[in-house]
Amino acid sequence: MKFAHPSEKLFTEHLDLFDIPWIYEPTSFPLKWGSGSIKKMFTPDFYLPSLDIYIEITTMNQKLITKKRNKIKLASKLYPNKKFKLINEKEYYNFLTQDNKILVQEAIAS
């Protein structure tokens, strides 16, 4: 499978290590409409069915983090029955250091 960023591949390898199922870019959520069409979409990087959570990973610059955080905030407001989480660089590396399934799940859910 081709990923948009190497960090996504490493993320899935760690999930696979603990048999945590994942789906890559499973769905897109409309965030803004106008003139009869969708103007803005949010496509999370992953959906983890066993935790019922959508994950967006960003290990890049602060500008992207702020933009993604705003999208997640809007998605959470528009889709209150869905759980979204942004994993920043610090959380990402913390996730990769977890060495058992429970700790991995807690790192994602926290």
Kindly give the residue locations of the regions a language model identified.
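Electrostatic, structured charged patches in enzyme active sites and in nucleic-acid/phosphate-binding
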Residues: 1-110
